[in-house]
Amino acid sequence: HELFYIKGARKSNVKVIPSRLSVLTKRINNDRGICFYCAGCAKSCNVYGDFSSGSCLIFPAQKSGGQIDLYVNSMVRTVTTNDEGKATGVSFIDKDENKEYKLKGKVVVLAASACSSARILLNSKSKQHPNGLGNSSDLIGKYLHDSTGGDMMAFLPQLIDRKTYNEDGVGGMHVYSPWWLDNKKLDFARGYHIEVWGGMGAPTYGTGFNVNSFNKFFGINKAGGYGDVLRSDMKKYYGSTIGISGRGESVAQKTNYCEIDPNKVDKYGVPVLRFNYQWTDNEIKQAKHMQDTFEEIIHNMGGIPLWGKPGKDANYGLNKPGWIIHEVGTTRMGDDPKKSVTNQFERLHDVSNVYVVDAGPFVSQADKNPTWT
């Protein structure tokens, strides 16, 4: 399927390059191996050839004598402070016992994700921080933005009835298209990249498709079947689809934000967030460009779209805010404490011993994953 995509994309003057993955191809130490396509990557890496916080950060720190205590099934409620307003630690909920405990520390580092870190800070009110910890600028939760997303899936008749073999390769996509155009000639800002999915990879969670819907492409009206008939159709069509996804950059807006809901708490009694987020014309026009590009590429490769092209009434298939889970901006960094929450080192302007090290401080997320995922 990648070869068909490359052919179709290049015909539309869309660049295609190998995808960038955090997977080792050369040995860097004795703790992690190199990828040799040994197993299903979705089930975790047996040789620690890929990046994960556990195998690459926590385990090495423990082995080198680092003092790390892991509190599993625990959720931070607030950052605790003293009379001077400095952080003294955190209060957290043991979700198994449904009890609240406190931990003391000289420095508090939050990495709960953009929205959850904002929630913790906003819930950490005190006499010294009546608007939430580190929120003298009133910007915690503001400028929330996510990647744009749009998709199209197609059927490639050329790929049916193939011999079944393993096309897994390295886990994740193998090729993709970075942004390739000049925005000065377009009606929207920023851009997006294209991800490519498909092939005969080993089935994983969520695998499945409506076999009967493929028969219509060959004028077959049968309703499918069970046993041998179903198995035959599955083998016939498996690996003959290709998915194309666009992931783009949205423009940060102060009017897009999360805040503490004054009327709702979770089952542990902790106030939850509520969201105010609307796409602008910029993102909607970007989504239209995605769909037009996908349609052209699929036509070039001889594919048949599996669903209708979304129109203006559906924002051209633009995914809902939050769907791509690339949230950034809620604790934005900057030099001016009145216009930002953290400094260039992701430390709160208001509290010198609290850091936010997730994607919250990023003022923009380009069209890439803001952190390792």
Predicted regions and their residues:
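Patatin-like phospholipase A catalytic core
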Residues: 1-33, 207-228, 234-238, 288-290, ...
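Non-transmembrane alpha-helical segments in soluble domains
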Residues: 6, 58, 62, 121-122, ...
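A glycine-rich dinucleotide-binding beta-alpha-beta segment and adjacent secondary-structure elements
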Residues: 18-19, 34-41, 71, 77-80, ...
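Glycine-rich loop(s) and the adjacent beta-strand/alpha-helix scaffold that form part
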Residues: 47, 62-67, 74, 78-84, ...
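FAD cofactor-binding and catalytic pocket of flavoenzymes
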Residues: 137-273, 278-281, 324-328, 349, ...
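A conserved FAD-binding loop/helix module that cradles the flavin
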Residues: 364-373
